[in-house]
Amino acid sequence: MKIPANGFTHAGKFHADDVFATALLQIIRSDIRITRGFVVPDDFDGIVYDIGFGMFDHHQEPREYRANGIPYAAFGLLWRVLGPGLVGERQARLIDENFIQPLDLNDNTGEQNSLCDAIGFFNPVWDSKEDQDTCFFKAVAVAKQILENQIDSANAVNRADEKVQQAYKNSRDGIVILPCYLPWKNGLYKTDALFVIYPSQRGGWSAQCVTDHKTKKPKLPFPQSWAGQPQEVIEQKSGIEGISFCHASRFLITAKDKETALTACRQVLKNNGRL
């Protein structure tokens, strides 16, 4: 879809929905001119959203609903059309599920959402002399940065997928070893991988459990006796020198080097009858 040079949305109090919808349009077309008003001019030539009962409004009946029952708001309607071109179909769906749907739900039902509250606080208070449109575009600038970060992160996952898949093909016993830190969850989400080992951004190496795509819990967590313990206790309990940390939730350890992390994962496999 080609974005026209002009956009129109409602005036008055603004919400996360129209703010993020505007941010999305600005990301795609930086020179778009946004007008706010209470009535769409008959001769308006551009994209209209969150007002006017058109393709990108959600105040009319019948409304559009997702398969899970969550109604679309203007941001979700725009993202459905424009998102795949920015990040691909899979990542667009994930951003909708994890980021946009809660905003759409808030706009349609008033359900509590902290990000929506934060955007709402940009509205001038009752006795303020601030111009409402100025406040609106301040909120849009913040929303644009947030959304750009989402898009950048999604595309980073897309770039990492090939490397993650290659590491998975080379893996043994359910242990995937990455050459560097990569966003790996997207690539291993529905595989039989059990652990991922990678150089830690804090130094040393990390080993992390792969979660079950249905339960969202680690398929094979690290031992309870390691969880949240100091290094000397973990080393004593495991018999492995160099494991410096095990998260209390048992999904992550850090170790001095790759071999130590690999030894720890193999011990868990052996103790659970997987080797």
Residue ranges and their predicted role:
Residues 32-42, 89-105, 136-137, 157-158:
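Short alpha-helical "patches" and their helix-cap loops
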Residues 40-45, 54-55, 187-189:
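Short loop/helix-cap segments at secondary-structure boundaries that form the rim of catalytic
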Residues 4-46, 50:
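N-terminal ordered "arm"
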